[in-house]
Structure formats: C-alpha cells, structure tokens
Amino acid sequence: MAEATTNTTTIIARADQHDIDLHKASDRVNFGSIREPIDVPYLLGVQTDSFDWLIGNERWQKRVQEDLENGTNTVPHTSGLDEVFQEISPIENFAQTMSLTFSDPYFEEPRHTVQECKEKDYTYSAPLYVNAEFENGDTGEIKSQTVFMGDFPLQTPHGTFIIGGTERVIVSQLVRSPGVYFDRSQDRTSDKEVFGAKIIPSRGAWLEFEIDKRDVLGVRVDRKRKQSAIVFLMAIGMTKDEIADAFKDYPLVMDALAKETVQTQDEALTDLYRKIRPADTPTPEAGKNLLDSFYFNTKRYDLARVGRYKINRKLGLEKDVNDRSLSREDIIATIKYLVTLHAGETKFPGKRDGQDVDLRVDVDDIDHFGNRRIRQVGELIQNQLRTGLSRMERVVRERMTTQDPEAITPQSLINIRPVNATIKEFFGTSQLSQFMDQNNPLAGVTNKRRLSALGPGGLSRDRASMEVRDVHPSHFGRMCPIESPEGPNIGLIGSLATFGRINPFGFIETPYRKVVNGHVTDEVEYMTADRDAEHVIAQANQELDENGNFVKKQALARVGEEEAVDVPVSSVDYMDVSPRQMVSVGASLIPFLEHDEGHRALMGTNMQRQAVPLIESERPLVGTGAEWRAAVDSGDVILAEKPGVVTYVSADIIRTMNDDGTTSSYKLAKFQRSNQTTCYNQVPLIHDGERVEAGTVLADGPATQKGEMALGKNLLIAFMPWNGYNYEDAVIISQRLVQDDTLSSIHIEEYEIDARETKLGAEEITRDLPNVGEDAVANLDERGIIRIGAEVEAGDILVGKVTPKGETELTPEERLLRAIFGEKSREVRDTSLRVPHGETGTVIAVKEITREDAEEDGDELPNGVNQMIRVYIAQHRKITQGDKLSGRHGNKGVISRILPEEDMPFLADGTPVDIMLNPLGVPSRMNLGQVLELHLGWIAHAGWDISLDPDAEAAWKKYVPQGAEKGAPGTPVATPVFDGVRPETIKGLLSCTLPDRDGNKLVGPDGKATLFDGRTGEPFPKPISVGYMYMLKLHHLVDDKIHARSTGPYSMITQQPLGGKAQFGGQRFGEMEVWALEAYGAAYTLHEMMTTKSDDVDGRVRVYGAIVKGENLPPAGIPESFKVLLKEMQSLSLNVEVLNADGVAIDMKEEDDDPSTSSDDLGFNIGARPDAAAKEDQVAEEPEFQ
C-alpha cells in the first residue's frame, strides 16, 4: 500500500529481505532458550521469487549471478518467458520452407500505478514485447520486427495481482511430480502381489509396466490395454539380441523373450498399433508415427527438468537435467528396477555424482513430499502462456499457407488474441486465482503462503482419500500439520511451514544445522524430503552447552521415516534449526501451542485470520516473538528504506532526508475498504526530527501496533460460571468494552450505480424523482448524489436515478402538456440506488466517473455506460450480543449477555473483570494453552522479579533465561512455540509478581484470586482463576446475520418467498415443522401456513385487503405449488383430475396470477404501506406546475 518517492522519481517500497535488513531489537522479554542460527526467510518469497523468475527481472538476475559465483543452484538459470518462447520457436509451415522465431521478450513501463488501478478498476499490467524473426527458406529473406504480445499482468510488491481493480492472489498448487513411480498391490483374484511402474511426464502420454500374478511382464501405452513389454522394446528399435544382452541377468525378462513370437521391428510396430487403435488399419509406419508422437516428439512429450531429475535419482542415471525427453536407456532401467523389486531384492546398481552406488529398492509413497512438488505462481502463468502460444502457433501455420510469401511480415502472421484470452481466463476464473483475504495482515500472509492440492491437474475433493489428506512425516518443516480448513477441504489445503522454501525443481526444502562428531555447527543446509530419510536428525530442543556440544550422551532423533528414537550423539548428522520449524506463520503466533490439542490449535490458527481489525490495535501481552516478522512481511506496515532523519509527518505522508543526500516520501493509506469490507488505515508511529535506520517501522497498518501483529485485545478474564449465562461456550462481557469502544471496529461498504443508454433513451442521475417527497432527497446535492458525511439508514436514497418507461399512445391532453412543458412530463420510473435492508452508516466518500472525464483522463467506462457513481458507507460497529469472540487456542464463543460494569465480579482492589468464560470449556477440549496464557498474562500485567523468591536455588529459576529475571508492569513477553515457559516456571513467577500500589498481591501463587460478586459485594466461596488473555473479535458479526422479512420477493415458479438474507427471503417452514404442527393438531395454523402465508397468490392479496379494511379473513384458495405439482405430473404424461369435496372435477384453468393485477381489482396498492397510501394520493393530487 505504501508508495515511496526518491528524488521525485516514484518507486514502490518493498518491505522484504531482498532490499532491507530486517534485524530489530524487540522490546518483548523472550522466555525462549533456543537460539535460531538463521532468520526466517522472507514470508512472501514463495510468491515474489517465482514471479521474478517468470519475467526475468533484475532481482532474479542478481540471484543467478550469486548462484554462479557460489556454485549453487537455488534458482533456475533461464527465465520463464525465455523458456516458453524458446520452446515454441521456430514455428514452421508444413513444407518447412518458412519459419518464425521469437527471442528476447521485454516489458515496457506499466501504464498505471497500483493505486490508480485499484481506484479506477484497471488491471495492473505492463505491455510485453518480443523480437519476432520471419525467414523465407525459398528466397533466404529474413524480416525482423518487435511485436506487441498484449498487456501482461504484473505482481505488486507484496505478491498480489490487481485484476479489474480487485486484489487477487495466485495460490501455489501441490501436485504429483513427473518421474518414475513403482508400486505393489494385491491381486484381486489370488493372494499374489502385482508390481507396477509408471513413467509420468509433465506433458504427454503415460507409460506403464506391470508384472502380473503369472509373473508376465506387460506394458500399457497411454493407459490403453496391456500388451507384451518385449514387443514394445522391439518396436522402439531394439533387436532380440540387444534385449538379451541388456537383460541377461534378469531371468523374468529372458523367459518372456524366449516365448515371444514377434521377430522384427515392423511386426512389433504393427502388433502394437493393432492393440492401441483396433479400428484402424495397422502398418509399421502408422505404428512408428504413433509411438513417436506419444513419447519421442519433444513438442508433445516433456518430462520437464524435474521429471528428468526424479528419474535420474530413482534409477541411478546421470543424464543432463535439461534432457527432457524419454530415452531407451530410461525404459531399460525402469524394467530392470521393476524386475529387481519383484524379485524381492533390496539393492539396485546405479550412479550418483559420478560414483557407482547401490540404490535402495522400494515402492514409492505417492503422498511423500519427495514425490509431490509445488507449482508456484510463475510456473502456473507460464503453463497458461504455453497453452495460449500453442493456440497462436496454429493460427501462424494457417496464415503461412494462405498469405502471399512476399508480403508476409511477423506482425501479419501473429494473432495475440488467444494468448491474452488464456491469461485473462486464468486470472479471472481459475480455481487457483483467489480473491485476496484482506481481513487482517495475517490473513493476507497466509493466503499467499497457501498450498492447494485442488485445481486443474490436481485432486478433486470428492475423490481425495484419507491418505492424501493425512499428515505425513515428510511434511515436517515443509507444510504445517496444523493449519488446514475444517470443511471438505481438510488436508487438501495446507500452509507452507515457517522456514520452508521452494527449490528450482519445485520441491519444498527445510533447513538443518550440520552436526560434526557431536558438535552442532552454525552451518545450515537446506534439504528436500527424500534426503531426510538418509540422515539422522536431532530435535531443536536438545540441550547444548555454550560451545555447541550436546550435554547428554543420547539424543532424540529421527532415523529414516520411523518413530523418533534415542541415538548416541556421535551418530547425529543434522539438527533442526528451530522448534517452530514444523509449523506455519499462523500457528507460530499461538503461545503455548505445545499444550493445545491438535484440532483446537487448528481452529485457533484459522480464527486468527478471521479477527477484525479494531479501532485501536493492541499487541498481545503474551506473544511468541513471531508477531513482528509476520506484520512486517505482510507489507501492511511501512518501513524506512534508507537511514536518515524524518523531516515531515502528517496523517497521510511521511518524508525523510536520507544520509546519502536523497529524500524519500512514504504515502499512507487512509480509511480504504479492504476486500472483506474491513477498514484499511495506516497511522504514523514516528515524530518530526526523529532518527530512523533502514528497516525502522514508520507507520502501523490495520491490526498492528509498534510494527507487531495486533489482532485483538488483552482483557481481564475470570474462569467462572455466572447464572447459566455462559453455559455451552457462551460469553459474558462487561459494558465497559462497549462504552470504551474496546472491541469496536469500522466496516466500509461500497455501493455502485451506473447510468446507461437504453432503447428508450438515456438514464439520468437527478434529484428530481417521480413520487418522492422532499424529505427523502434532503441529503442529495443538486446532481442527485448523497453528500459526504450524511447519516443514512435502510431505504435512504444514495443516488437519484430515473429510467425512461415504455412510451404509450398519448392523449390530446398529454400532448398539450408535453408541448407546453417540453420533456418534463415524460414517463420515467424511479431506479435510484438505495441503502439495502438492514444496512446503516455514514457516507465517507463518493467517486464519480462520467464519459467526458473518462475520455480526458484516458479512463475506460464499459460500453453503453454514461456515468458511474460509487458511494462508500462506513459503519462503526460496537461489540454486541450475538457477536463471536475467540482466544488463540480454539476457545470460541458467542456473547450471550452484556452486564453493567457494576454487576461484574471484581478483584479485591475493586477492578471488575472484563469477561467471564465457562471453566467447563477447558477440560474436554484439552486446550490448556489458554490457562497458561491467562497466568502468564497476569504476570506480564503485574510485573515480576524473581529475586522476590527467597529460595535462590529454586529449580524453576534455571529455566528463566538471561534478561527475563524481572519485568515492569505491562511488559510484553514472548513464549516461542515448543520452546515456551514451563508450567513450573509460571508457578514460580506467580509467587514473584510485583505488589500493587497498596502493597497487595491480588492473585495468589496458584493463579487464583478471591472475587467479589458485583451485585451483593460478597466474596465468592472459592478462589477463581483470573488473568489476562488475548481475545479476538471475529468477522462473524450479528449485524450481518440477523434478518427479518415482512413483504418481499416471491419465486416465479412456486410463488413462495425466496430463501436467505441476500435475497431478502422468508423463513422456511419445512417438512419437519409441518409434522410438529400436525402432532399438535393445529390444523388452522397449519392450513394458514401452507396457503395464505406461503403461495396462495390470490388468497394472500385478499387477506391483505381484508386486514387493511378491517374485515374478517376470506377462505384460502389453492396454493401455487399444488399447480406446479400438477404440471410436473402432466409432464410425465399422467392425466390428473382435481376433485372437490363432493367429487366434482374442478377446472384448473390457466389464469393471470399477477398479484398486482389482483390487488388493483380489489382497489388498493399492495406495494405501499397503509400510511403511505394517503401521502401518495396527496402527491398525485397536487398540480405539477406549482
């Protein structure tokens, strides 16, 4: 959101590790004892690094340069766009006499800034150009041109895309990696095992080998029926002698070779073709063409670099990773490995790094993270570009044959429409292109780090098995085992672990510290999941001395994929870098996560993302130390780019004079609407004249305080029941939270209306509306648009608009009036924009774009639209009954009662508690983290000094790290996940809290306090757990859910009210509710429910008339749904007759059931309220020319 200006040139400030050093001394007292040897990688790198590679920008070039200097391989060394244009070049005609080659793609500057795109509904993009060279082989003539390839969407500095004015995120996809896979399964008809091998490419046909229950080696080409593998080997050009030579040590293959009757390659090709295409005439040429098109044509078959890498590793080959086609050697090695696996042997000879090695023979686990890779944003867009270019290739070929060869230029051959259409479709409609979650900064970071197994080329949620969804040992340090949705997508959508990064092949790597002879070094190595199993890896919380040696002789370590075991420290190869290595950013923000049950931790992680930014953010007293990094990397706080001095601060701009003589200015976002209707606002933190370093936080964003994530409020909590009002997770809160706006938030809604050109004339934005009184338009300006600052409620007019009605034949009198008053008396209807039902608030902004303005500014209005107006309404929502509150441990509840402050239980010094939670919410849920947080929260609030405990040798004191021996009241503390404060330390600290100003300690060493009943002043009989807990207000607000309907729309077919708040629907009276009334024998009520109150069209109009006139209710008619049932039965060719009580047939004739005509017959207006009818008559009676 922040834009920085340096020496009058505008650049976008990017708060990431590429540009700014993020080291910062936090004022949190950290109780963690484990030092992390490396910083967390840039959290949005999963998005930005991939897009940098795609477009080949300077940041990517810098990383390639570093790779070449260090001899490493952390990024691909060819950019994504270059790769795609190299693949498609050259495009040749069928006679191969002409060719078109592409090279050197580059971008011009974007036409609009990110902010402009958001305000004016543009796509943030830059024009893409490429050099195209056409060569005419007959004449030798070469024509070169720079060709415009369309506007290419660009990534914003924070890893998002602006598509049509809305911010979107492309989610990374988790897919099966190309390569070779071996499996073993039980045969259905016997007790024997069947062995299979699949060679799966990135693009192209599968090749599968199988050894069945009769020990026969078969092959399936492109998933068709099985045939002899020997015939296949002969078809790809091997003679029987070559087969015998290659497989002389493999009796199973030799037996099959001896039995094979096919002798030559031609016979083999014919045989193969006959089985794949039984309907066509088999010939050797057809067979060869078929095989070549399946496996040996680089345009149609591509293993990709990752597929080649996987095949090399699995089969012990040493081919270049850029060799992306399938070779005879790969096929031979696959068959050898399969036969070795079938024979039950455990070793297979191969090569690794130029050495002869024995590879382990085993089946592959498809859910292992060595076999699943990530398709990042760059690769996903590249695949779309490839699809678009291949469609364009067809057009180019056709044009080569139809155009005059002399007149052809590259520009005349190329049609960029298919390329642009493919990319537009991907960003607009793909399952992986998501509306960005901007509820709070954490939601945004998580959205960008999400890993989805769904989407094109992935799994579907209906067919995904339990195994795919389950947590796998190889997820450790790569994908969080906790963070996942609760619904049908559980386990299919995950989140990248905190330290995880993605290598050039798309596999997730996690860092480990190298251990040499029991000494833990600071050298860090990143490893993929298939390398984990080859080493012995110790946990991060193993005790080390000051020199980095293990204190104990044994260490708990992972050996292969088995359970953790104790091993001698001399055999440890690596050690985890951090205890929070296995969890995601969201989960690492939960203190005492190690004391919470898994399901509740999952809920806690998900609910943090639903926290609404409050008017005044407050960071947690009890944190984990990850808050600062999560907030800074989200991009919602503004950081100083360079060291310098602040020269100017206002609410919307900060300027600094930098040490290098340049000036920078940082623009703050003020009261903008987020995608989730929350308020996006940035507030300066620094003062004029203050010194700043590079990376200093200059301004807070929504839900951040002092540059730390601040999603909720620290509130005084008591675990106690209160008159049953907090039964079953209900929550009782104090009136103080309402009065002081402690949990109040601002929500901004956007309403849009446009004036179009219609067949009957142009719509008009105006204040002059038909049949509308002056008081209804009092807040509109002379143009007919609401004034800023107006307080509006449901039904109020925001923008006045009239639309021409269909012209009817005019009477002489009307023609006379039309002649006198011109167009004034023309028939128009009121189509104004009104505040929807149930909404209210203050108008804070109005944006207007007219056709004239648009042409001047170069804006684009859709066809047929003359004027577009947007109105922004802000709501100030206080906390209220029915709103949902939650802690960070999955402890959620709905507010059932707001008590006056004087009725709340209070501490001995008179402090009333803020919230009462039910203690029964803890034991069965097993989320004890909330209890530990409560106690540590009190310690942090009260302050502590461990010297207050007279026992200097107390055992708990050795767990208090240096620097955490004492803290002033209100000191924020950090208890990192899996390295947090121990329960015994909390117990000790509770006895060392500082007394209040009267010298009293309100909470005892057991964490409990004597509370007094606010109503009687008497103490409660037992001490109660009291402390500070961080509570979040979730985006499940009762104002958005509560709904009531009196008169509203009906369904066209059934004539019953629609359903749901969005449709202004009614309350469904379903089949079970009908049974309930039947059980009570309430016949009249039931009859009324199913006719008058539902879909008896004529009847409900008559009832309305009877109520208005004060008459008795008329009898009900036939419900519309009965007529629908009749029609459905008649559509099944059934002749259905309707009989009355006397057995006489009723004629169900078609009649005009328009309720408005029925009401007109009865002489009243159904659309108006009774009190409005008189007013309307008055308005109609007044002469128009007054």
Swiss-Prot record:
The protein's Enzyme Commission number: 2.7.7.6
User: Quick one: where's region Disordered?
Assistant: 1149-1186
What is the organism field in this record?
Bifidobacterium adolescentis (strain ATCC 15703 / DSM 20083 / NCTC 11814 / E194a)
What function does the entry list?
DNA-dependent RNA polymerase catalyzes the transcription of DNA into RNA using the four ribonucleoside triphosphates as substrates.
- Source organism's superkingdom? Bacteria
Subunit: The RNAP catalytic core consists of 2 alpha, 1 beta, 1 beta' and 1 omega subunit. When a sigma factor is associated with the core the holoenzyme is formed, which can initiate transcription.
Give the UniProt family note.
Belongs to the RNA polymerase beta chain family.
InterPro entries cross-referenced by the UniProt entry: DNA-dir_RNA_pol_bsu_ext_1_sf, DNA-dir_RNA_pol_bsu_external_1, DNA-dir_RNA_pol_su2, DNA-dir_RNAP_su2_dom, DNA-dir_RNAP_su2_hyb_sf, RNA_pol_bsu_bac, RNA_pol_bsu_CS, RNA_pol_bsu_protrusion
- Please write the reaction equations for the catalytic activity of this protein: RNA(n) + a ribonucleoside 5'-triphosphate = RNA(n+1) + diphosphate
What GO annotations for molecular function exist for this entry?
A: DNA binding; DNA-directed RNA polymerase activity; ribonucleoside binding
Q: Which Pfam families match?
A: RNA_pol_Rpb2_1, RNA_pol_Rpb2_2, RNA_pol_Rpb2_3, RNA_pol_Rpb2_45, RNA_pol_Rpb2_6, RNA_pol_Rpb2_7
- Alphabetically, which GO biological process terms does the record hold? DNA-templated transcription
* Record's keyword terms, sorted: DNA-directed RNA polymerase, Nucleotidyltransferase, Transcription, Transferase
Protein name per its UniProtKB record: DNA-directed RNA polymerase subunit beta
Give Gene Ontology CC terms: DNA-directed RNA polymerase complex
